[in-house]
Amino acid sequence: MLQAIGWPWPGPPADSAWQAMCAMYSQCRPARVIEQHRSGYVVAEAPEVPIKVESLPAWQRRSFPPHERAVVGDWVLLDGRRIVALLPRRTVIKRLAAGEHYRQQLIAANLDTAFIVCGLDGDFNPRRIERYCVLIASGGVEPVVVLTKVDLCVDVAAAVAVLREHSSQALAVVAVDARKAEPVVALYPWLLPGRTVALLGSSGAGKSTLTNTLLGEQRMKVGEVRQRDSRGRHTTTHRALLPLPSGACLIDTPGMRELKFTGEEDLVEEFADIELLATQCRFRDCAHQAEPGCAVRAAIGCGTLDPQRLHHYFKLRGEIVGAADRSMLRRY
């Protein structure tokens, strides 16, 4: 029954690190974290069979690093109703938590795909989607853009074209009416049995509506959206893993207002075109400003690279370097 909640193998784990952990705790059994609350965790060993469990004592200490605690999507080992170990993560999406101090916040773990849900209304922001893609791809997860509220957009094809201009990778973009089952069929290639998908996006983007459609029932509360800024209230208040009729698992998440980098990200996937051009520069330490033999500047000069794309590349790279510096200072 573990396969029905995303266990990645047909039998015992094939990963050597997982094998070692399971052998070390041979009397324990694996389970998946399906809900995370301030008071503790809810796990499952089979679909629709939630178990409220005690976490490791170390996790309850305020000084314990938050990113080392379990998060929705994690696999743990249980002894009765007590978590005794956290299995190594295959993938993870994380961001820098809001506030002055450096603190990582995990969004979800052990994902195959993340749907970036964006409404084709005032919520549509290609630069923010680009930022999502960097966070997601850096965690080893495949990003897929899901455009909702197609009834509010005069030219959906033009919106899709704009997104493709802002991405150098083969980014999948799917436009759907999240309220109807038929268009959502287009998402099924990412919802195969055993796969895990997370929904990310702003409040009011249509994540809960899409979740209800994929579930085939009205389980998630849907909120109204303010017309002046196309933002909604947080109808999803905590992360939860839900088995879908297709055999996949869906992680619904609260709306995300801030997307700060942790300093561990890279831009290789989202800005592959610029990274490739940089390898062709005359100088290895080229800053792509006014150096002779700069392939990046040459691409701008001949019109094959958008100057705004390079500007955003510099902006994101600066944020990542700044976050990495804050992380280093925190260690000393």
Swiss-Prot record:
Provide the binding site for GTP. Answer: 148-151, 201-209
Q: Which residues bind Zn(2+)?
A: 281, 286, 288, 294
Which cellular compartments is it found in?
A: Cytoplasm
List GO molecular-function terms, semicolon-separated: GTP binding; GTPase activity; metal ion binding; rRNA binding
Key words of the record = Cytoplasm, GTP-binding, Hydrolase, Metal-binding, Nucleotide-binding, Ribosome biogenesis, RNA-binding, rRNA-binding, Zinc
Q: Which CDD domains does the record cross-reference, listed alphabetically?
A: YjeQ_EngC (cd01854)
This protein's GO cellular component annotations are: cytoplasm
Which InterPro entries does its entry note? G_CP_dom, P-loop_NTPase, Ribosome_biogen_GTPase_RsgA, RsgA_GTPase_dom
Q: How is the cofactor bound?
A: Binds 1 zinc ion per subunit.
Class of the enzyme per the UniProt entry, highest EC level? hydrolase
Pfam families in alphabetical order: RsgA_GTPase
Q: What does this protein do?
A: One of several proteins that assist in the late maturation steps of the functional core of the 30S ribosomal subunit. Helps release RbfA from mature subunits. May play a role in the assembly of ribosomal proteins into the subunit. Circularly permuted GTPase that catalyzes slow GTP hydrolysis, GTPase activity is stimulated by the 30S ribosomal subunit.
Name-wise, this protein is: Small ribosomal subunit biogenesis GTPase RsgA
Gene, per the UniProt record = rsgA
